[in-house]
Amino acid sequence: MPALRLTPITLGLSVLLSVGFACAATTLPETSISAEVDEDDPRVKETSTATRTATPVRYVPQAIDSVKTESLRSYGTNDLGQALSGIPNVSSGADTRFDSVRIRGFDASNDFYLDGIRDDSQYVRDLHNIERIEVLKGPAAVLYGRGGQGGIVNRVSKLPMAGHKSSIEAQGGSDDLRSVYADLSTDPTDNISLRLNMGNQDNNSFRDGVSGNRQLFAPSMSWQLTPDLNWLVQYEYSRYNRTPDRGIPGVNGRPADVSRSTTYFDNRDYIDDKTQSLRSKLAYELNDNWQLRQTLGVFKLDSDFDNTYQTAYVPATHSVTRQRWQQDLTTLNVFNNVELEGGFSTYGLEHRVLTGLELGSQRRDPKLYTATAVNRGGQAVPSLDLSQPNRNLSHTGRMSVSSNNHTEVESRAIYVQDQLRLNDQWQVLAGLRYDRFEVDTQNKLLNTQQDVKSHSTSPRFGLVWTPLEHHTFYASWSKTFSPAGGGLIGITPNAAGSVNDLSPELTKQKEIGVKSDWLDDRLSTTLAVYELELYNRRTSDPLDRTITLLSGLQRSRGVELTATGKIVGNWYVRGGVGLQEATVEKDNNGFEGKRVSDVAKRNASLFITWKPEMGWYAETGLTLVGDRYADSLNTVVLPGYGRWDALAGFRQKEWDVRAALNNIADKTYYASATSVAQIQPGEPRSVVVTGTYSF
């Protein structure tokens, strides 16, 4: 595949602005995209993530949680992990390199989407161009293909909307947080709407030596080419340069008893992510009942890092061992999707049918360097004292190439879905998808190569019953597949004659629940009960540890309850509680009977907001997380915690000023972990002040 060069100017401005202003003289009907009415209501009443059609949430036979990012940014939240904190049975990881999330006990770090397009590269995502985040829980292969064992995370971006106001936002706070962002909108003609989100953020951290800088440039255009044809084009450039932070180690089964500001990296460490995406969506109304859509997504990531991180605690010397890695990573993903959606009736039955064709092409080129010792047999990277680390002790030897791979992935899929309305009480959702997936990895160091071809058929079935006007009961069953090489995009080429089983892993879910509206439809709740099984989990052959078999079993069972909406008057609520048991049931690597790492048995959140249309307003909330294990062998425990946050503000027609206080009780807690040596402390008490001017 030829090299593809994407730059902010050439793609962002030339595609959007030049096209828009070149057609400024054309007068056609107004774009159909319009602004949301009630911005204070935390509910999202309609979603396309679950069905890829505009479907009311209450008629989706699967749990789905939506979070509006505006309320989160007031607390200084600008990353995905923090944004999803408190969602029932969702936990965020602590990998400093990229976003890491577990949904219902299963890793979803490669199940991220942007406006329904796969975005699975390894980086930390910016939320300033995002309207809301939707978490679809359970297998989603019918519409999204591979992965998604516990669910998917879809970011819904800010769209150009006719008549939308512009705004400028400035923010400052603890640890030298300072940022300025602009959200600018204009309608050069009746049929063209433009929007530009851009900004810059700088911050230090309560963690010694940690800092970061974010940059964002995201123009978009909606162009009503004809009364029946709309073209939406979106571009985003994001850069995040930061200090990699691997937290603190575990000691004697608990996080080390050191200051939460203690760090063990090298002063020269850095991570520099530069991401670009270009998305195009053409929507053609064939008639009143049928629509044809074509969506193209191009994603490019350039990521470099130099990271010295802790690997273990040594009690005999009261020291922390370390290793150093460098990486140059480039990824290029191209996805093309064509869908036909329409409605019709047969024998009194109403159908909403969706058919689709999806083509994907992905390239990944990681080159990894490892530290070597200055003297033969010596220690490559100096260890540091646990309590008083001297980060000036650096690795001074050379870096040697330890891995240099090139991976190509080609995916093809067709799918069909029918939302069938039997009568006023009963609805059926049925879908089927067929995927072909091919991954080819070349090891440039060893001059070896291996390709794996796999295919899978993924079904989905749901039943919705509405015996009462405000209460909908549902039951669903779904299945997904995870092919070899479909996670981090790549496989490890083996020697000729390898007998590893590289067939896809398979996951199935059973879920029942009830979705209700209360208080004259002001408050919405969802109660869900589920069982999720990865029933051919990869594990080692007990007779030969070098051979991989598909004989393991991982299971998650749980209950979730969410509530969002308006209680009375100007009082709003959002929150939920999750209970789950996520364990490895069968395994040959010593994990059998162990809880899945970094997954709590229970978590909850509750935020109550008082927000009149104008004047003073306030919000307060609690986030509760139970204890978790830092590792798969369950040797180090992260204690459960509760965090109390609050916010107060004052708004008029054009101005909105608010101040947020995070972790009011200044409680020491541990947010997550990636291993026994890498546990991330939670943020201490901090303040964030935000001012927004709208015009």
Model-based region annotation:
Residues 281-297, 301-307, 472-474, 503-569, ...:
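Membrane-embedded beta-barrel scaffold of Gram-negative outer-membrane proteins
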Residues 353, 475, 510, 596-695:
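Conserved C-terminal beta-signal and adjacent last beta-strands/turns
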Residues 241-254, 363-365, 438, 464-511, ...:
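Surface-exposed extracellular loop regions of Gram-negative outer-membrane beta-barrel proteins
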Residues 128-131, 142-219, 225-229, 276, ...:
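Outer-membrane beta-barrel translocator/receptor signature
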Residues 28-163, 480, 512:
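Acidic, small-polar-rich N-terminal luminal/periplasmic segments of exported/outer-membrane proteins
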Residues 522, 528-533, 550-633, 665-668, ...:
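Gram-negative outer-membrane beta-barrel transporters
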Residues 201, 205, 215-285, 298-331, ...:
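Acidic/polar loop-and-plug regions of large Gram-negative outer-membrane beta-barrel proteins
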Residues 278-301, 322-442:
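Face-selective signature of the C-terminal outer-membrane beta-barrel domain
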